[in-house]
């Protein structure tokens, strides 16, 4: 779990996302509150529920990017899902409880990596012994099995060479466990327990014996470490810790929530809109979900929802769902100055990416101040005249601008290009000024 302060979280987000300070502060405080809650007494801790967030803002302003970067900072089970992928219970499609099942699978993987990391040293020792056994086979007869000083010394010599990497390219025959073939069964609602039993049955049937393989010691060592570490992990403890991690630290990011708003008077069942909203209510409020790893309570899982709300309003969500998303954050539309900052300030910005890509061909590309101003202005103008798709417009404009250089780069190794205002004007002015061309090309 992340122990970063809100200011540190915002600083990390600033390295990748321009502006939107209100949204950054809200998610930073929400993430820090997860840590604060865990410092309370156990009894009092149960009373402190997370304050779920609804982020509202036009497309391309950073809502999804905030989620992506937050996932890396959280160091906790985190899942980002699109609300449009789910349907009401009883209809064909994913039901919303699948979100928690997927989140639990993520927690299992996270916990397994942590536990394997703790026992890695012991796993390395065991793997080392298995490789030495393959290099120096033990005698099969009892009268030869007594270890002599010379055989012990030989083993130590090989151990030293192995640790120094002198034997990395030597090939050996070792027995490696075969990967298990998983069988995924789609279960109807309420029959998850039977599905879990069937999956366990297929899992046991699919266990293949270890297979002898010939490989280099360097590759064998990596495989054997993973195999030995997996043996040292207690599966029951793993499941308990993972479920605890989901219940106490889990975060769900619900994207495109505006797409499940009811629009106008429609007849017939609203399978993937209002029905999904109703199914989300108990999940966000707190309920128990059956997963193949055990029962998971959702009372303290943090939900962050986001939507553009261009065709609808937050008030179009059913009132009960609005009440369960108490913190509202509005993200601002991007200006030409924001576009300019997006092109230069973030870590691995768009301009840096193109410079690095062309550098692989031996072509030097430089973006002047006037060139960056012109690119930002062009993207902003197209957004104003046509559909406003936010910062995503920069990708389209940059790709069109760099098209000629990218195409000819392989034949122009050693060349240098300066992208200034004149270059941008020559390549983009016709497209920006002509509204019809802008609609179809940019």
Swiss-Prot record:
Protein's gene: hslU
HAMAP family according to UniProt: HslU
Pfam families, per database record: AAA, AAA_2
InterPro entries: AAA+_ATPase, ATP-dep_Clp_protease_ClpX, ATPase_AAA_core, Clp_ATPase_C, HslU, P-loop_NTPase
Location in or out of the cell: Cytoplasm
Subunit-structure text: A double ring-shaped homohexamer of HslV is capped on each side by a ring-shaped HslU homohexamer. The assembly of the HslU/HslV complex is dependent on binding of ATP.
Transmembrane segments: none
Region (Disordered): 137-156
Annotated protein name in UniProt: ATP-dependent protease ATPase subunit HslU
Family: Belongs to the ClpX chaperone family. HslU subfamily.
PANTHER family named in the record: ATP-DEPENDENT CLP PROTEASE ATP-BINDING SUBUNIT CLPX-LIKE, MITOCHONDRIAL-RELATED, ATP-DEPENDENT PROTEASE ATPASE SUBUNIT HSLU
NCBIfam families: hslU, PRK05201.1
């Amino acid at each position: 779990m992340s122990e970063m302060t809100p200011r540190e979280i915002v600083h990390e987000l600033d390295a990748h996302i321009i502006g939107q300070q209100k949204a950054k502060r809200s998610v930073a405080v929400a993430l820090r509150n997860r840590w604060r809650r865990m410092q309370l007494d156990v009894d009092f801790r149960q009373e402190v529920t997370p304050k779920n967030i609804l982020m509202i803002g036009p497309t391309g302003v950073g809502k999804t990017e905030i989620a992506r970067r937050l996932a890396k900072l959280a160091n906790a089970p985190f899942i980002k899902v699109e609300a449009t992928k789910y349907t009401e219970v009883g209809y064909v499609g994913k039901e919303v409880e699948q979100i928690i099942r997927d989140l639990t699978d993520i927690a299992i993987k996270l916990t397994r990596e942590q536990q394997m990391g703790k026992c890695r040293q012991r796993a390395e020792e065991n793997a080392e012994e298995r490789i030495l056994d393959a290099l120096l086979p033990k005698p099969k007869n009892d009268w030869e099995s007594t270890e002599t000083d010379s055989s012990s010394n030989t083993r130590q010599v090989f151990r030293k060479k192995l640790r120094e990497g002198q034997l990395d390219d030597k090939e050996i025959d070792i027995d490696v466990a075969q990967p298990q073939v998983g069988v995924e069964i789609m279960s109807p609602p309420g029959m998850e327990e039977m599905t879990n039993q069937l999956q366990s049955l297929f899992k046991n049937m699919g266990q293949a014996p270890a297979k002898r393989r010939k490989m280099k010691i360097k590759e064998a060592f990596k495989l054997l470490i993973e195999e030995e570490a997996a043996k040292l992990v207690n599966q029951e403890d793993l499941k308990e810790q993972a479920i605890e991690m989901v219940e106490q630290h889990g975060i769900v990011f619900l994207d495109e929530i505006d797409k499940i708003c009811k629009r106008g008077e429609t007849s017939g069942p609203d399978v993937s809109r209002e029905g999904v909203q109703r199914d989300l209510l108990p999940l966000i409020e707190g309920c128990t979900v059956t997963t193949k790893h055990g029962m998971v309570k959702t009372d303290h899982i943090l939900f962050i929802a986001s939507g553009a709300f261009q065709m609808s309003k937050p008030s179009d969500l059913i009132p009960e769902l609005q009440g369960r998303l108490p913190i509202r954050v509005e993200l601002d539309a991007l200006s030409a100055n924001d576009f300019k900052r997006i092109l230069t300030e973030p870590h691995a910005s768009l301009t840096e990416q193109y410079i690095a890509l062309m550098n692989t061909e031996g072509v030097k590309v430089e973006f002047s101040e006037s060139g960056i101003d012109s690119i930002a202005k062009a993207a902003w103008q197209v957004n104003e005249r046509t559909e406003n798709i936010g910062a995503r417009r920069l990708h389209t404009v940059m790709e069109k601008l760099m098209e000629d250089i990218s195409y000819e780069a392989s034949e122009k190794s050693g060349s240098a290009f300066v992208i200034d205002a004149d270059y941008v004007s020559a390549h983009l002015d016709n497209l920006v000024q002509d509204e019809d061309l802008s609609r179809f090309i940019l």
